[in-house]
Amino acid sequence: MTQTRARTVFLLAHTGRPAAIRSAELVVQGLLRSGLGVRVLEAEAADLPLPDEVELVKEATPQCLDGCELLIVLGGDGTLLRGAEFARASGVPMLGVNLGRVGFLAEAERDDLDKVVDRVVTKAYEVEERMTVDVVVHKNGDIVHTDWALNEAAVQKVSAERLLEVVLEIDGRPVTGFGCDGIVCATPTGSTAYAFSAGGPVVWPEVEALLMVPISAHALFAKPLVTSPNSVLAVEVQPDTPHGVLWCDGRRTVELPQGARVEVRRGAVPVRLARLHHASFTDRLVAKFALPVAGWRGAPH
């Protein structure tokens, strides 16, 4: 790795999107003009028109962010979650620019690139920590897999024609059992992702909690559950039914052994997000989902 400048920003982009390529070019030019160094993965640099001053790294490891003060991610939700993997492993804050649809993890839109560069150069941003979950898979008392998630860990059925038979547990006590398509164990950040699509509540990110949301459960009591952030959630797949599959943030998957037990608890390592705006989460929610608020009068003054 070549010698870095005093201030360096790592850039991660979805180079399969033409909009991302153009956006990356604009961000790189703006940062270099302002005297900041830019670092990019060599595999992505092949698809980007980058000047020679850009530092290239070969391997996508947490160490490739050593010395970087910020990780800028250009893309949709999938790219932002990929960036979150780098951010968590390195401790470097992530600043997302949404080039997709909803982009709840993003702090800016494509039209905000000039402002993004200006805020980064002047360090006019704040950093907040987002809760994660750690996931442990047990089989006959042995740990067979571990993972983590920023949004959610989902236990889902594999066979389309048969339900996944599960028993839910919270803090060492059984809650209920039923057949379903799956169970989503989510963070407040993930409450607007898969858990939201499954009928779960929207939880403000300032709230510390864990969510357990059934997917298409065949039961009268199959409501979303909101627990303490210190609770331990467990999904036990019944041994006499087809096995399931574990998805973490929709990116990493592993087939579960028959009769597996999946435990989800508050993660030991958060993801740090860079924030440019002081807008409330309520305003972000309204904007992202284009919610109808016509007729709102507000509290009398």
UniProtKB/Swiss-Prot annotation:
One of its GO terms (molecular function) is NAD binding. The active site is at D77 (proton acceptor). Gene3D superfamilies: Probable inorganic polyphosphate/atp-NAD kinase, domain 1 (3.40.50.10330), Probable inorganic polyphosphate/atp-NAD kinase, domain 2 (2.60.200.30). Its main location: cytoplasm. Keywords: ATP-binding, Cytoplasm, Kinase, NAD, NADP, Nucleotide-binding, Transferase. Its EC number is 2.7.1.23. It comes from the Bacteria. NAD(+) binds at D77, G78, R82, N151, E152, R162, D181, T192, A193, Y194, A195, F196, S197. It is found in: Cytoplasm. GO terms for biological process: NAD metabolic process; NADP biosynthetic process. It holds the Pfam family NAD_kinase_C. Involved in the regulation of the intracellular balance of NAD and NADP, and is a key enzyme in the biosynthesis of NADP. Catalyzes specifically the phosphorylation on 2'-hydroxyl of the adenosine moiety of NAD to yield NADP. This is NAD kinase 2. The gene is nadK2.
